[in-house]
UniProtKB/Swiss-Prot annotation:
This is Holo-[acyl-carrier-protein] synthase. Its cofactor is Mg(2+). Keywords: Cytoplasm, Fatty acid biosynthesis, Fatty acid metabolism, Lipid biosynthesis, Lipid metabolism, Magnesium, Metal-binding, Transferase. SUPFAM superfamilies: 4'-phosphopantetheinyl transferase. Mg(2+) binds at residues 8, 63.
Amino acid sequence: MIVGLGTDIVEIARIETRISEVVEKELQTNRLAKRVLTPSELDIFIKSSNPGRYLAKRFAAKEAAAKALGTGIGRGVSFQHIEISNNENGAPIVTFSAGAAERLAALGGVKGHLSIADEKHYATATVILES
């Protein structure tokens, strides 16, 4: 049974503007990236050939997940409580911890399904929470 559904869209240029003035060595200190990404996501971001697009997709995915939880970011759920990774085939995976995991359990949810897409100007993500 579906216990939550969330979607988000991000204009990639807005994210790229926030990191465009930063040289590669300083990507790890970018305030937006440090706020949104977990340590393992930050490692991938730093090595990415297109860090703005990577960050935009993760931002959209985490916002969609927070919306599916019914809280948005805040009220006990932070960007750091939602991690986006990929399975061996490259499909995106959403993992919840701390406040996000507590909220998922309160909804009776056990698993999240994530789809991420991007085109020239936009990144979008949808999360479905399943009981």
